[in-house]
Amino acid sequence: MAGALRKTMIYLGLADGDEHYESEQLNTRKDEDETMEADREERRAPAPVREVSRETSYTPEEEYRAPVTPIKRAASSREETSGLRQITTIHPRSYNDAKLIGESFRDGIPVIMNVTDMGESDAKRLVDFSAGLVFGLRGSIERVTNKVFLLSPSYVEVIGDDKKASDTQASFFNQS
Protein backbone atom coordinates (compact mmCIF):
# COMPACT_ATOMS: atom_id res chain seq x y z
CA MET A 1 0.00 0.00 0.00
CA ALA A 2 2.83 2.35 0.85
CA GLY A 3 4.35 1.60 -2.55
CA ALA A 4 1.25 2.76 -4.39
CA LEU A 5 1.11 5.93 -2.34
CA ARG A 6 4.79 6.58 -2.96
CA LYS A 7 4.37 6.08 -6.71
CA THR A 8 1.42 8.47 -6.74
CA MET A 9 3.42 11.09 -4.86
CA ILE A 10 6.31 10.75 -7.33
CA TYR A 11 3.90 11.00 -10.27
CA LEU A 12 2.34 14.18 -8.89
CA GLY A 13 5.76 15.64 -8.16
CA LEU A 14 5.28 15.71 -4.41
CA ALA A 15 8.27 13.42 -3.77
CA ASP A 16 11.61 12.74 -5.43
CA GLY A 17 12.04 9.47 -7.23
CA ASP A 18 14.91 7.80 -5.35
CA GLU A 19 16.73 4.84 -6.77
CA HIS A 20 17.23 3.61 -3.20
CA TYR A 21 13.49 3.38 -2.79
CA GLU A 22 13.22 0.34 -5.08
CA SER A 23 15.68 -1.68 -2.98
CA GLU A 24 13.86 -0.63 0.22
CA GLN A 25 10.57 -1.72 -1.30
CA LEU A 26 11.95 -5.18 -2.17
CA ASN A 27 13.21 -5.62 1.41
CA THR A 28 9.82 -4.54 2.78
CA ARG A 29 7.98 -7.05 0.56
CA LYS A 30 10.22 -9.88 1.75
CA ASP A 31 9.54 -8.95 5.39
CA GLU A 32 5.79 -8.83 4.70
CA ASP A 33 5.87 -12.28 3.04
CA GLU A 34 7.68 -13.78 6.03
CA THR A 35 5.19 -12.22 8.44
CA MET A 36 2.20 -13.52 6.45
CA GLU A 37 3.62 -17.06 6.38
CA ALA A 38 4.17 -16.99 10.15
CA ASP A 39 0.56 -15.86 10.61
CA ARG A 40 -0.69 -18.75 8.47
CA GLU A 41 1.22 -21.27 10.58
CA GLU A 42 -0.27 -19.81 13.77
CA ARG A 43 -3.77 -20.14 12.34
CA ARG A 44 -3.23 -23.80 11.49
CA ALA A 45 -2.23 -24.67 15.04
CA PRO A 46 -5.22 -25.97 17.04
CA ALA A 47 -6.43 -23.81 19.87
CA PRO A 48 -5.95 -25.24 23.36
CA VAL A 49 -9.08 -26.86 24.77
CA ARG A 50 -10.16 -25.78 28.20
CA GLU A 51 -12.01 -28.22 30.40
CA VAL A 52 -14.90 -26.94 32.47
CA SER A 53 -15.52 -28.71 35.71
CA ARG A 54 -18.95 -29.07 37.25
CA GLU A 55 -17.70 -27.30 40.36
CA THR A 56 -17.37 -23.97 38.55
CA SER A 57 -20.75 -24.17 36.83
CA TYR A 58 -23.60 -21.78 37.58
CA THR A 59 -25.85 -22.60 40.49
CA PRO A 60 -29.29 -21.06 41.05
CA GLU A 61 -28.48 -20.14 44.66
CA GLU A 62 -25.96 -17.57 43.44
CA GLU A 63 -28.60 -15.71 41.41
CA TYR A 64 -29.20 -12.17 42.58
CA ARG A 65 -32.81 -11.13 42.98
CA ALA A 66 -33.52 -7.43 42.99
CA PRO A 67 -36.22 -6.16 45.33
CA VAL A 68 -39.47 -5.58 43.46
CA THR A 69 -41.84 -2.78 44.29
CA PRO A 70 -45.39 -3.26 43.00
CA ILE A 71 -46.78 -0.39 40.99
CA LYS A 72 -50.39 0.54 41.58
CA ARG A 73 -52.39 1.18 38.46
CA ALA A 74 -54.20 4.44 38.10
CA ALA A 75 -57.95 4.13 37.93
CA SER A 76 -59.10 4.16 34.33
CA SER A 77 -61.40 6.86 33.06
CA ARG A 78 -64.20 4.29 32.78
CA GLU A 79 -64.07 3.57 36.49
CA GLU A 80 -63.91 7.23 37.39
CA THR A 81 -66.92 8.16 35.30
CA SER A 82 -69.05 5.14 36.12
CA GLY A 83 -71.25 7.53 38.09
CA LEU A 84 -71.63 9.98 35.18
CA ARG A 85 -71.87 13.44 36.67
CA GLN A 86 -71.02 15.79 33.85
CA ILE A 87 -71.99 16.56 30.25
CA THR A 88 -70.41 19.43 28.34
CA THR A 89 -72.37 21.62 25.94
CA ILE A 90 -70.27 23.46 23.38
CA HIS A 91 -71.48 26.14 20.94
CA PRO A 92 -68.54 26.44 18.53
CA ARG A 93 -68.25 29.65 16.51
CA SER A 94 -65.39 28.44 14.26
CA TYR A 95 -63.40 25.32 13.47
CA ASN A 96 -60.78 26.46 16.02
CA ASP A 97 -63.16 25.35 18.79
CA ALA A 98 -62.58 21.71 17.75
CA LYS A 99 -59.74 21.52 20.28
CA LEU A 100 -62.15 22.12 23.17
CA ILE A 101 -64.50 19.41 21.86
CA GLY A 102 -61.65 16.93 21.43
CA GLU A 103 -60.16 17.56 24.88
CA SER A 104 -63.51 17.15 26.64
CA PHE A 105 -64.36 13.95 24.75
CA ARG A 106 -60.87 12.54 25.28
CA ASP A 107 -61.30 13.04 29.03
CA GLY A 108 -64.39 10.82 28.92
CA ILE A 109 -66.99 13.58 29.14
CA PRO A 110 -69.99 13.32 26.79
CA VAL A 111 -70.25 16.42 24.59
CA ILE A 112 -73.32 18.10 23.12
CA MET A 113 -72.15 20.04 20.08
CA ASN A 114 -74.44 22.79 18.77
CA VAL A 115 -73.25 24.03 15.35
CA THR A 116 -76.21 26.34 14.62
CA ASP A 117 -74.02 29.46 14.86
CA MET A 118 -71.52 28.18 12.27
CA GLY A 119 -71.42 28.39 8.50
CA GLU A 120 -72.33 25.31 6.48
CA SER A 121 -68.76 24.44 5.42
CA ASP A 122 -67.27 24.89 8.91
CA ALA A 123 -70.14 22.89 10.42
CA LYS A 124 -69.41 20.00 8.03
CA ARG A 125 -65.71 20.16 8.88
CA LEU A 126 -66.47 20.09 12.60
CA VAL A 127 -68.92 17.18 12.24
CA ASP A 128 -66.29 15.34 10.19
CA PHE A 129 -63.69 16.00 12.89
CA SER A 130 -66.11 14.80 15.56
CA ALA A 131 -66.89 11.64 13.60
CA GLY A 132 -63.16 10.87 13.39
CA LEU A 133 -62.71 11.63 17.07
CA VAL A 134 -65.57 9.33 18.03
CA PHE A 135 -64.27 6.58 15.74
CA GLY A 136 -60.74 6.83 17.15
CA LEU A 137 -61.91 6.65 20.77
CA ARG A 138 -64.60 4.02 20.06
CA GLY A 139 -67.50 6.23 21.06
CA SER A 140 -70.71 7.11 19.27
CA ILE A 141 -72.19 10.20 17.65
CA GLU A 142 -75.90 10.87 17.41
CA ARG A 143 -77.93 13.67 15.93
CA VAL A 144 -80.23 15.37 18.44
CA THR A 145 -81.65 18.03 16.08
CA ASN A 146 -80.67 19.31 12.65
CA LYS A 147 -77.40 20.92 13.83
CA VAL A 148 -76.98 19.53 17.36
CA PHE A 149 -74.98 16.34 17.95
CA LEU A 150 -74.23 14.19 20.98
CA LEU A 151 -70.77 12.63 21.23
CA SER A 152 -70.77 9.78 23.75
CA PRO A 153 -67.80 7.77 25.03
CA SER A 154 -67.94 4.00 24.55
CA TYR A 155 -69.08 3.27 28.11
CA VAL A 156 -72.09 5.64 27.94
CA GLU A 157 -75.37 4.17 26.72
CA VAL A 158 -77.81 6.61 25.14
CA ILE A 159 -81.45 5.60 25.42
CA GLY A 160 -83.81 7.38 23.07
CA ASP A 161 -87.19 6.97 21.37
CA ASP A 162 -85.92 6.32 17.86
CA LYS A 163 -82.77 4.16 17.63
CA LYS A 164 -82.80 3.92 13.81
CA ALA A 165 -81.71 7.05 11.96
CA SER A 166 -83.77 7.94 8.93
CA ASP A 167 -82.16 8.38 5.52
CA THR A 168 -82.53 12.16 5.72
CA GLN A 169 -80.69 12.29 9.04
CA ALA A 170 -77.96 9.95 7.83
CA SER A 171 -77.40 12.06 4.71
CA PHE A 172 -75.85 14.86 6.78
CA PHE A 173 -72.94 12.56 7.70
CA ASN A 174 -72.33 11.68 4.07
CA GLN A 175 -69.70 14.22 3.05
CA SER A 176 -69.37 13.14 -0.60
From Swiss-Prot:
Subunit structure: Homodimer. Interacts with FtsZ.
Biased amino acid composition, Basic and acidic residues: 17-45
Chain residue ranges for the region called Disordered: 13-65
Keywords assigned: Cell cycle, Cell division, Cytoplasm, Septation
Family: Belongs to the SepF family.
Subcellular location, principal: cytoplasm
Gene name of the encoded protein: sepF
Lineage of origin: Bacteria, Bacillati, Actinomycetota, Actinomycetes, Micrococcales
GO biological process, one term: FtsZ-dependent cytokinesis
Annotated protein name in UniProt: Cell division protein SepF
